[in-house]
Swiss-Prot record:
Assembles around the rod to form the L-ring and probably protects the motor/basal body from shearing forces during rotation. It is found in: Cell outer membrane; Bacterial flagellum basal body. The lineage of its organism: Bacteria, Pseudomonadati, Campylobacterota, Epsilonproteobacteria, Campylobacterales. The keyword Aminoacyl-tRNA synthetase does not apply. It comes from the Bacteria. The keyword Lipoprotein applies. This is Flagellar L-ring protein. Residues 1-20 form the signal peptide. GO terms for molecular function: cytoskeletal motor activity. The gene is flgH. It comes from Sulfurimonas denitrificans (strain ATCC 33889 / DSM 1251). Coiled coil: none annotated. Keywords: Bacterial flagellum, Cell outer membrane, Lipoprotein, Membrane, Palmitate, Signal.
């Protein structure tokens, strides 16, 4: 009974174990469906512009002279991501310790006050010539250093999600690129000031507060370099 049970489940366990040691083999895809906020927004109705008599500025949504920077919710602003990271740190530690212990006095002692007994004990200790001594030395020295230099430059279009009470904008944007079965995902979010947006409706990522920038790839390269979930579990509990 037990043998039949093992023969039945052993292949299943082997398949599960081997599948855990490999990454997900599904190919990456891009969802071309419109975002949820686009579906929820009603279609815009055409509004005619009216011109005031004797005025060159005009009225309506497209006046002749106006600032075309992003100002409202769902307006688009271009974020120029230019991040450089440089770090260098080093450390060293050295510890040394030395102990020495010597015990003399011989192997025999006398608690009495008789001079003859004390003399005899002293002679015995001289003949035996016993004593105790120990020496211990330990030393530790460690040194390490790390240097990192990375740069990332690109542009992402983001939309204004919320206009805060103080006039600042919370923006969020995402870009996905699929080339030769390699998917690149760039996502950004943060708070910006409307005064930092230039006339070309652009803003630098260094002018963002609470900036969060995500860049990752999906595809064959990721599958080749990523560890399977079975390997991760084994390494998490492996004590050595």
């Amino acid at each position: 009974m037990i043998r039949n049970f093992l023969l039945f489940f052993m292949p299943i366990y082997a398949i599960l174990f081997l599948s855990g040691c490999t990454a997900n083999l599904s190919d990456p895809e891009i969802d071309f469906e419109p975002p949820a906020y686009v579906e929820e927004m009603p279609s815009k109705e055409d509004n005619k512009d009216f011109t005031s008599v004797g005025s060159v500025f005009g009225q309506g949504e497209n006046p002749l002279f106006s600032d075309h920077k992003a100002m409202h919710v769902n307006d688009i602003v271009t974020v120029i991501i230019s991040e450089n990271t440089q770090s260098s740190n080093s450390g060293s530690k050295q510890i040394s310790e030395s102990d020495s212990l010597n015990l003399g006095g011989g192997a025999f002692t006398s608690a009495g006050t008789n001079s003859a007994v004390n003399s005899a004990v002293s002679k015995l200790n001289g003949i035996a010539n016993l004593g105790f001594g120990s020496t211990s030395d330990s030393a530790y020295k460690g040194q390490g250093s790390a240097t990192k230099d990375a740069s990332f430059t690109t542009t992402v279009s983001a939309r204004i999600v919320k206009v805060l009470q103080n006039g600042n904008y919370f923006i969020s944007g995402k870009r996905e690129i699929l080339v030769d079965n390699q998917k690149q995902i760039i996502q950004i979010g943060g708070v910006i000031r409307p005064y930092d947006i230039d006339q070309g409706n652009r803003i630098n990522s260094s002018q963002m507060s609470e900036a969060k920038i995500l860049y990752k790839t999906q595809g064959d390269v990721e599958r080749a370099t990523d560890r399977g979930w079975g390997t991760k579990i084994i390494q998490s509990v492996w004590p050595f």
